[in-house]
């Protein structure tokens, strides 16, 4: 690390996981940083301490398996990149099977101590109530899902009122190769061809009356997750949980998101479905499909059981389960460029959950990328995005443009927060052992190993550029 104290400092707003990682990466590159954190001057209903990188929910960083799990691959890539968050997590690990879980207090204290001790990092405990003044120059905003209202309003004013969401309306997402296409079929309602469409843009899962009634009953009876007190989220009709719609009456769903009109079962064209669940392509690769209109507050265990009642989804593998909770995140594919800068004001860069990633590790990873991109620019170097074959690149690609924009639902947003998963990675050829044809679980594991190996090799090559 060489010190470039003659450089003007980079300002980082937000001392959570992403902001802490971004500040560390910048300082490690020899560029001075001012890290602004509003706690303890102003607290939140979720945070309990004034430590940086406080974990407000679980203490788990999820799977540490870098061979067959996408988040484990992201762990490995972050370690290769000298991540502060991963170093402190490893140092404060607690037993958790194959997962990386941490002593939450020891972890956040360690992050805070490392940042406070760094000679190029200055920590300012103050609330930033608006967008940074132009004299600050390069600034990273990493204020997370609980961004203070005044700053959120300033961001909304700069970007456009519709560009900042305050609720996650998350529907489950399913791996395409786990959908039974002997039961389901491709068709858009009334064979409508939209922009970039073919008239066969949805996967349709048919139900007869008996299946529909059993499904509605299961939704009503399923275990629900209550809103956390600090979320204070009212229901609104444009984003009602699927189980709340079911409670409004037995016919509500089949006249709403499960309406069968305009659809003909390609496998049995003479029989009209009583109800239909539609799945819409979720990423440009076509490896992931989301359940249209199925935002939910059902507990995860209930979701998997109930949604596998849907014909064609009996063996569904979920890349993400549904949810509805308070959040603050940008419509990043529209607003940010491929190195996380605001297109309309390129001295501003965003990082962490405010960009539309989901999870501790993902937020930290985007903070790491934002820090590296910023440091490169300050040192008059090129900010080179990671390849899409890496976990870094797959996640960045989702945030900055890997989702599908649709015009068939006026007023609704197609971009939703996402955890890293193999469905975001470009496909890979799976090597076949001589004389052996891989099937089932064996084939799935081989595919994941191939994706992981390619990701780590490509990540090493990318890091060699810096």
Curated annotation (Swiss-Prot):
It catalyses: uridine(54) in tRNA + (6R)-5,10-methylene-5,6,7,8-tetrahydrofolate + NADH + H(+) = 5-methyluridine(54) in tRNA + (6S)-5,6,7,8-tetrahydrofolate + NAD(+); uridine(54) in tRNA + (6R)-5,10-methylene-5,6,7,8-tetrahydrofolate + NADPH + H(+) = 5-methyluridine(54) in tRNA + (6S)-5,6,7,8-tetrahydrofolate + NADP(+). Belongs to the MnmG family. TrmFO subfamily. GO terms for molecular function: flavin adenine dinucleotide binding; tRNA (uracil(54)-C5)-methyltransferase activity, 5,10-methylenetetrahydrofolate-dependent. Keywords: Cytoplasm, FAD, Flavoprotein, Methyltransferase, NAD, NADP, Transferase, tRNA processing. FAD binds at residues 14-19. One of its GO terms (cellular component) is cytosol. PROSITE patterns: GIDA_2. It comes from Brucella ovis (strain ATCC 25840 / 63/290 / NCTC 10512). Its cofactor is FAD. The keyword Transmembrane does not apply. It comes from the Bacteria. The keyword Cytoplasm applies. It is an enzyme of class 2 (transferase). This is Methylenetetrahydrofolate--tRNA-(uracil-5-)-methyltransferase TrmFO. Its EC number is 2.1.1.74.
